[in-house]
Design a protein with these regions (language model features):
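TPR-adjacent "capping" and linker segments in tetratricopeptide-repeat scaffold/adaptor proteins
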Residues: 1-12, 35
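Structural signature of tandem alpha-helical TPR/SEL1-like repeats
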Residues: 22-31, 59-71, 95-104, 131-140, ...
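Canonical positions in the second alpha-helix
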Residues: 35-36, 71-72, 107-108, 142-144, ...
Length: 236
């Protein structure tokens, strides 16, 4: 069989496995992935690792998950790199190691994996497992936000609000919080409500302030929104 035929066959089986997985037929998917994974197919290895990590179609086994994910990651599979990073971050199947987590997140982020970009941005902002780097945190957050990652949108609002490596810019802060808020990010809703209450970056608007603060409270950010809500309600 030619290399092209083998490649086409592998891709066809991968597509069949993914369809089965999405339909909830996890065992069928694993039966299709396993032979490919044992033959060294990186995406199949990554998917096997994810299955063992989540305990879908097989008993959850972080050790086996790490074994498959490492094989995929070392071949350059971005999903494998991201999930291996998660294992190091959480200490699943390996000793917890923030530096190793950051290293693998960065490899995946450099391949345009938006979830890795989002997580790496957060780690760079806090200096967790890597040197604190506000410029890199902003850069990775911008990339992840472009893919719709709402946490990065909210983080960019915080970066501009708190002048973390940039000039303080209330307008940009409110703009990023708005983008995250309409997508349901409770903390961004609270901060946007506070911005409307104070007239920082947006025109002062108590109705809008109450709207977003109440949504934040309902969405689980009640502690953050509470003080602003009291102020907004006292003024109406």
């Amino acid at each position: 069989m030619s290399w092209l035929a083998r490649t086409f066959g592998a891709e066809r089986r991968l597509a069949q496995a993914l369809a089965a997985w999405n339909a909830g037929d996890h065992g069928v998917a694993l039966d299709l992935w396993a032979p490919l994974a044992h033959r060294g197919h990186a995406r199949a290895q990554s998917n096997m690792g994810a299955a063992f990590l989540e305990g879908r179609g097989v008993e959850r086994d972080p050790g086996k998950a790490v074994d498959w994910l490492r094989r995929a990651a070392e071949q350059g599979d971005a999903g494998g790199q991201r999930n291996l990073a998660l294992c190091y971050y959480e200490g699943w199947g390996v000793p917890q190691d923030q530096a190793e987590a950051a290293r693998w997140y960065e490899k995946a982020a450099e391949q345009d994996d938006p979830d890795a970009q989002d997580m790496l941005s957060w780690m760079k902002l806090l200096g967790g497992g890597c040197p604190q780097d506000y410029a890199a945190a902003r850069r990775w957050a911008e990339k992840a936000a472009a893919y719709g990652r709402v946490g990065s949108m909210a983080r960019l609002g915080d970066i501009y609000h708190n002048a973390l490596g940039v000039e303080r810019d209330p307008v940009l802060a409110a703009r990023w919080w708005q983008r995250a808020a309409v997508l349901g990010h409770a903390e961004a809703q609270a901060m946007l409500g506070a911005a409307y209450l104070a007239g920082k970056g947006v025109a002062r608007d108590r109705v809008q302030a109450l709207h977003w603060l109440e949504r934040a409270e309902a969405g689980g950010a009640g502690e953050l929104a509470a003080g602003f809500l009291r102020q907004a309600r006292a003024k109406t």
